[in-house]
Amino acid sequence: MNVLIFGPNGSGKGTQGSLVKDRYNLAHIESGAIFRNHIKQGTELGQKAKAYIDQGELVPDDITIPMVLEVLKNEGKDGWLLDGFPRNLTQAKKLWEALQEEGINLDCVIEIQLDRQEAKDRIMGRRLCENDPNHPNNVAIDAIKPDGDTCRVCGGALKSRSDDQDEDAIDKRHDIYYDTQNGTLAAAYFFKDLARQGKTRYIELDGARDIQTIKNDLLNQL
């Protein structure tokens, strides 16, 4: 099974993506990790990508698409979950064209939907336990809301990540994601149109619900 997953930062996309990956034994392919690996290995594409990243610019699609395809064909030959790409409509169209040319099926596209303000509240509400950062604590989610400044799992002290409190950075990321004309949602809707044509499946999930309910809904639809 080959799967694309969309969802704004704060929607629980990582949690549900991990569920799908583990349940179907898929390779988890994340665009940021692809760049880091190529740069670390000093590949030609990695060197080209680094030149743009060092200047604070987006890596062009003619570099990104070949990187993604290479990983899909090698690491994902038995099935993959692609996360973090495409980020805009142009990339979505180019990715689809490349998949068609390579004869790679896209079996399913998952979109986790969440109101922009709620997504922002969840990001800013995240708290890290000093004993184990994997303990779920979020002051904006009732199901995992901590008791004051102590971890709801172990009682350890909690702190917030500085980047989770950077409203400007959060807003910029969400500006890209929630752009329905050219941004990430436009990319998701491109695949939704393909699903209407019978070329893939498109699963929409209400991300405002609790994790277990979303999980059950997702597994039922898959």
Regions found by a protein language model. Give the residues of each.
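Glycine-rich phosphate-binding loop of ATP-dependent small-molecule kinases
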Residues: 1-222
